[in-house]
């Protein structure tokens, strides 16, 4: 069975369910590649022969984001900031003191906007719901930012990838594969630089946390 036949054998409903589930679990606070899954599904929707509807993909992602964030909010509000201390001991790679400190700093700086912007920032995507709940952000304000951010992120990402996929053939005919490779490399480079910048900020906050802990112990 070739790749095209394999893709055509996947029911569209299964694609929507996977998108909603992965995005929802990531929004709940469990690190999963929600954005990668969304982009992949949007790429599938740009191929008419696969019968995957881009509106279904975007809608599933929005529902997953809103429901997952709301559950994460409830958990954070129930257990408070000590929840992140326990998670940090078990999963230091994702919930270490530096990660939590950076996310909390962004929340303190941006307020409810951090929930909206968290849809577009990998670090905040898993922290937005639980941290908003732990910081006792009023739920109506959280929900408004959550729904708005989910629609903009999921709808915008799906539309961008869908229309890019539809226009890809014409674009390649005009600009060649070399231009596409250059564009992909530029995008990957930008993503790496952004990740490195975030990692440096986290490392600095980790070091600051260690210094404070050492001072307290002394």
From Swiss-Prot:
**How does the record say this protein sits in the membrane?**
Multi-pass membrane protein
The record, for InterPro entries, names: DedA-like, VTT_dom
rRNA-binding among the record's keywords? no
Q: Does the keyword DNA-binding apply?
A: no
Membrane-spanning intervals of the chain = 10-30, 55-75, 147-167, 175-195
GO cellular component, alphabetical, reads: plasma membrane
Please give the superkingdom of this protein's source: Bacteria
Which keywords belong to this entry? Cell membrane, Membrane, Transmembrane, Transmembrane helix
Localized where?
Cell membrane
Provide the family line. Answer: Belongs to the DedA family.
Indicate what this protein is called per its UniProt record.
Uncharacterized membrane protein Mb2670
- The organism of origin for this protein: Mycobacterium bovis (strain ATCC BAA-935 / AF2122/97)
């Amino acid at each position: 069975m070739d790749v095209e036949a394999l893709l055509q054998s996947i029911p569209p409903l299964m694609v929507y369910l996977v998108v909603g589930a992965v995005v929802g679990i990531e929004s709940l606070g469990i690190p999963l590649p929600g954005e990668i899954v969304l982009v992949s599904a949007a790429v599938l929707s740009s191929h008419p022969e696969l019968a995957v509807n881009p509106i279904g993909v975007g809608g599933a992602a929005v529902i997953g984001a809103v429901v997952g964030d709301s559950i994460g909010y409830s958990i954070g509000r129930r257990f408070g900031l000590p929840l992140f201390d326990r998670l940090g001991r078990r999963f230091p790679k994702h919930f270490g003191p530096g990660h939590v400190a950076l996310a909390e700093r962004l929340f303190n700086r941006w307020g409810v906007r951090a929930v909206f912007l968290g849809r577009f920032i990998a670090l905040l995507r898993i922290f937005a719901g639980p941290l908003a709940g732990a910081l006792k952000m009023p739920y109506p304000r959280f929900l408004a930012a959550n729904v708005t951010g989910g629609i903009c992120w999921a709808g915008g990402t799906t539309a961008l990838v869908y229309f890019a996929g539809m226009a890809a053939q014409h674009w390649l005919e005009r600009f060649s594969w070399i231009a596409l490779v250059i564009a992909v490399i530029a995008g990957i480079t930008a993503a790496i630089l952004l990740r490195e910048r975030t990692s440096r900020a986290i490392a600095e906050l980790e070091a600051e946390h260690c210094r404070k802990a050492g001072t307290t112990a002394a």
